[in-house]
Regions:
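Core catalytic architecture of nucleotide-activated donor-dependent transferases building glycoconjugates
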Residues: 1-176, 180
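Long, positively charged, glycine-interspersed low-complexity recognition regions
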Residues: 153, 166-189, 193-209
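A donor-sugar binding/catalytic signature common to diverse glycosyltransferases
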Residues: 190-234
Length: 234
């Protein structure tokens, strides 16, 4: 086993909490996941472009699960419908499905089932062409304000952040952990790891270009969780 293949999570507290969170979302491979980094440096300057880029890639994943031929033109029309403030913009030049193996481009088997323990805040789509977007979307982000994430919520009515899972008992337990050495609360340090562990068990995952966290989740953790080969670098 290579060093990269050993970079998954083994901490029992983290595994217990992430498994409970995944189950609350409906189970492994029943939800999409995205990492949206927006708050600092170049990411702050490019926040609108970043949200639009991941929006296109997420919608492509959801739509191609039921229609493999869905392309940029189809998704652009959906954007004009769901995010009218972007209607004057040309389609972004981004790969629609990047770093997601073709095997992942299938409908999640239980995404609409009643197994989810978390309540979706948005109103579910009823139009047939939009129903695939009812799939739960887990969002890991450093900016949780409604305006920044509004395009995602408009497309995915079941958009869920880590804070929305705070009632899951195992997550509350993780948040209460303290260091045995100095009594420092560990919750804030474990939250990004919990985000990553949840994302790794999504049906498909999309990240922010240039983010090392996104690269780790997309290129290593998600692939480990799904039994795909990990590309060796350097």
């Amino acid at each position: 086993m290579s060093i990269r293949e050993r970079l998954g999570f083994a901490n029992p507290h983290l595994l217990t909490a992430s498994t409970a969170a995944v189950n609350a979302l409906g189970g492994k491979d029943t939800f999409l996941a995205v990492h949206v980094r927006l708050s600092d440096g170049p990411f702050r300057a490019l926040r609108e472009q970043t949200v639009r880029s991941v929006w296109y890639r997420l919608v492509a994943c959801a739509m191609r699960g039921v229609n493999a031929s869905a392309g940029s033109a189809d998704i652009y029309e959906l954007e004009r419908l769901l995010v009218p403030t972007n209607a004057v913009l040309p389609p972004p030049r981004v790969p629609l499905v990047q770093s997601v193996p073709l095997a992942a481009l299938r409908p999640p088997e239980a995404s609409m089932a009643g197994e989810r323990r978390i309540k979706c805040a948005g109103k579910q789509h009823v139009a047939p062409e939009l129903v695939p977007l009812n799939v739960p979307l887990f969002v890991a982000t450093d900016v949780e304000d409604g305006l920044a994430l509004a395009p995602l919520r408009a497309a995915f009515p079941c958009t869920i952040l880590l804070r929305d899972l705070s009632d899951v008992p195992e997550i509350r337990t993780l948040e209460r952990l303290v260091s045995a050495e100095d009594g420092v609360p560990l919750g804030p340090f474990l939250a990004p790891l919990l985000d990553a562990a949840i994302m790794g068990r999504a049906w498909a995952v999309v990240g922010t270009e240039g983010s090392t966290f996104s690269t780790y989740v997309e290129g290593l953790l998600w692939r480990l969780e799904h039994g795909h080969q990990i590309a060796q670098r350097g």
